A protein has these predicted regions:
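Solvent-exposed loop segments that connect transmembrane elements
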Residues: 1, 42-57, 70, 77-95, ...
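Conserved C-terminal beta-signal and adjacent last beta-strands/turns
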Residues: 1, 5-13, 17-21, 182, ...
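Transmembrane beta-barrel architecture of outer-membrane proteins
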Residues: 1-4, 16, 24-34, 103-111, ...
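Gram-negative outer-membrane beta-barrel transporters
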Residues: 277-281, 285-292, 296-429, 503
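Outer-membrane beta-barrel translocator domains and adjoining extracellular loop/strand segments
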Residues: 33-39, 140-147, 207-213, 276, ...
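Surface-exposed extracellular loop regions of Gram-negative outer-membrane beta-barrel proteins
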Residues: 1-12, 19-23, 106-189, 255, ...
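Outer-membrane beta-barrel signature, preferentially recognizing the C-terminal barrel domain
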Residues: 100, 104, 202-281, 307-310, ...
Length: 507
């Protein structure tokens, strides 16, 4: 990633505006992924052979708990380490692996300007700034559409272990955004402020969603293959065909944001604040789904993915097959429907995030001088976040509570902090290192810190030194991911973490 920035700042006199900032920002980034994997076959494949006695352990391995009974126990790494296995490129047999190999490039040029202002309105001091950004984006992606060929290899018609040119795909797009912003602060009374902010923001879609790559899969299930060749039957019963791909033409996530807050600073260190916020999500990435003809794919130059003798079936005995219970005599050929679903990502989903937040920092010497140095800081955030299709917005908990008790005096500082948040949607790595959504259970975490700043001490030779000890997750809370039924699918245990810091400042 490369970034360059040119900025000019100038002060303004005899005007409502006190300072102006203009500039240009350029950045580019490149991301690639090579989904590489291998499977091992014995040198005797496709024939089998006995396990050499040198690799055997005494007795059998009890796998009855997995329904596998008792199996031969042997050192599985030994034959591999001795060169008795041959590694085979899994990408030649797994279309989804090749379809997850890609690169994405992006160039972003931003013109920006901001003006700071300070004035009075009806006797109230008003400060703030107004600004704009003009953002030009050029993005592109190249990759592969993983497809099984007539030789049953993936994109390797010549069996030369090179990806066929017909499987290569590339797309690019350009777009512009105008992003205004406004921040206003009004001092309605001594040390009391009303603040308002409005702006438009954008955020790139996930890199894996912007990839050009994709793949075609076929489910070798006779009940799906024996579905009538009509769109109505496919919509009712399903289909063995499926296609998945990213979308390099995706626009950024876009939001119009509004914030209103009241702040009261009743002490040099004490304040209370109440805020409300609203985010109008005018563009969000969603899952697209389209019925296509897999013998004439309009999304891939009319490609025909059907392979005679591989995608069809010869019935071995009389009977009814498929969800429609169609009768086939032994020896009959069953041909799958031409139609299936193409899944991809697209723009256009909308939603909103709204909520309120209460924040306070209260030095307890306001209660009693005997409590000088002690204090409490806390916040409570309530969020209602949802997309128009009813799905959740990643990273958003409905409730987040935090409370910190502290003591600060004469260079000595102690803090205990607790945070509680409800469950939230997130992303995690799934099979073949792919990204999938997951629900993270709510947690309550306890952290602590103790430190001493020697600049407050009488040891002049130690002035500038600060020593601190931090502890996080002191109650050893696990990180849990659950499925739609609330069953824990992943549990990660990190345990408490302790960090001892020595910082020295020379000025």
């Amino acid at each position: 990633m490369n970034t360059y920035k040119l900025e000019f700042v100038g002060n303004i006199e005899d005007s409502v505006f006190t300072k102006a900032t203009v500039g240009l920002n350029y950045s580019d980034r490149y991301k690639d992924k090579d989904n590489k994997g291998f499977f091992a076959t014995a040198k005797t494949y496709p024939l089998s052979g006995a396990i050499p006695s040198a690799y055997l352990y005494n007795g059998l391995a009890d796998l009855t708990w997995a329904g596998l009974g008792y199996v031969v126990a042997y050192d599985g790494f030994a034959p591999y380490n001795d060169g008795n296995y041959i590694l085979n490129d899994a990408g030649l047999l797994e279309p989804d692996r090749l379809g997850d190999t890609y690169n994405v490039t992006e160039e972003v040029t931003t013109l920006f300007a901001k003006g700071d202002f300070e004035t009075q309105v009806s006797g109230f001091p008003v400060t703030g700034n107004v600004g704009m950004q003009y953002v030009k984006t050029d993005q592109a992606s190249s990759g592969y559409i993983g497809v099984v060929g007539s030789n049953f290899a993936v994109c390797d018609a010549n069996n030369d272990k090179q990806v066929d040119a017909v499987c290569v795909t590339e797309q690019s797009t350009s777009y512009n955004h105008f992003l205004p912003s406004l921040n206003v602060s009004v001092e309605v009374a001594d040390d009391q402020f009303v603040r308002f902010a409005a702006n438009k923001t954008i955020s790139r879609a996930r890199i894996d969603q912007m990839k050009a790559s994709g793949f075609v899969k076929f489910d070798q299930n006779i009940d799906l293959i024996a579905i009538p060749n009509t769109t109505a039957a496919v919509e009712q019963y399903g289909t063995p065909w499926s296609k998945f791909a990213g979308n390099p033409l995706l626009k950024p996530l876009e939001s119009n944001n509004f914030d209103l807050a009241f702040e009261n600073y009743f002490d040099e260190e004490g304040y209370v604040s109440a805020a409300v916020f609203y985010k109008d999500l005018v563009n969000w990435t969603r899952d697209g789904n389209k019925l296509i003809n897999f013998t004439n794919d309009e999304t891939n130059a009319g490609a025909n993915y059907f392979i005679p003798g591989f995608h069809d079936r010869i019935i071995d005995q009389d009977g009814t097959y498929g969800p429609a219970d169609i009768f086939y005599a032994a020896g009959s050929k069953v041909t799958p429907p031409n139609y299936g679903y193409f899944s991809y990502f697209e723009d256009g989903l909308k939603g909103s995030v709204k909520g309120a937040e209460l924040t306070a920092n209260v030095p307890l010497n306001k209660v009693s001088s005997a409590l000088d140095g002690f204090g409490l800081a806390g916040s409570s955030t309530y969020i209602d976040a949802e997309l128009e299709d009813g799905s959740r917005i990643p990273g958003q908990s409905d409730r987040v509570l935090s409370l910190t008790a502290y003591y600060e005096k004469d260079g000595f500082e102690v803090r205990f902090a607790g945070t509680k948040r409800s469950d939230f949607l997130t992303y995690e790595r799934g099979g073949s290192n792919k990204i999938a959504t997951a629900t993270r259970n709510g947690v309550t975490l306890l952290d602590a810190q103790v430190s001493y700043d020697f600049s407050e001490s009488s040891y002049t030779q130690l002035k500038g030194l600060r020593v601190s000890l931090q502890g996080t997750n002191l109650t050893d809370v696990d990180e849990e991911t659950v499925d739609g039924n609330g069953i824990v699918t992943t549990r990660r245990q990190f345990g408490p973490t302790y960090l001892l810091n020595f910082n020295y400042a020379f000025y």
